[in-house]
Amino acid sequence: MNSICFDTETTGLHPNGSDPDEILTISIIGRDGSVLLDERFRPTVKTEWPHASAVNGIYPEDVADLPTIETAIPRLREIFAGADEVIGYNVGFDLGFLSAVGVRPREDARITDTMKEFTWFMGKRKRYKLVDAADHIGYEWTGRAHGSLADALATLAVQRWLEQWLVAE
């Protein structure tokens, strides 16, 4: 099975509408942790995103001279077309942003939401942040939390931990 794990950082929470938020960075890794794509983009609509910047640390000047996501769409489509499984933390959020730019997983791809699986494991009805799930499993961060590559690696670690736990049961 060809599995990928990915994360995005965005200008906000809403990929659709008259003033849509946009993807600033996307990182995609294979199940073995190899980096398939790790890119930043200049938004085409938004000129500032102070609330998102406070979380993800990406400011307009950081991406002002970068290409737009349009340059990466062929590669994104290729990666998602080859994936039998797509893993993410609150994956619907990220998939919504990809869908807004015309990138979707295959219809027969398994969509694995590590946040939902971790919440089920914990037996609670609240949403666990990725940093909390990673802390719970003793994950040591490589990079800054809320960076797309660091978050993709942490998501994969939590997913692997959950799968090992399920096998042990």
Model-found features: residue ranges?
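Conserved non-catalytic scaffold segment of RNase H-like nuclease domains
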Residues: 1-108, 123-124, 131-146
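Short secondary-structure transition/capping segments
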Residues: 85, 112-116, 161-168
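Acidic two-metal-ion nuclease catalytic site recognized across multiple nuclease folds
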Residues: 1, 136, 153-169
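Acidic donor-binding loop at a coil-to-helix junction in glycosyltransferase catalytic cores
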Residues: 150
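Short, flexible loop segments at boundaries between secondary-structure elements
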Residues: 111-127
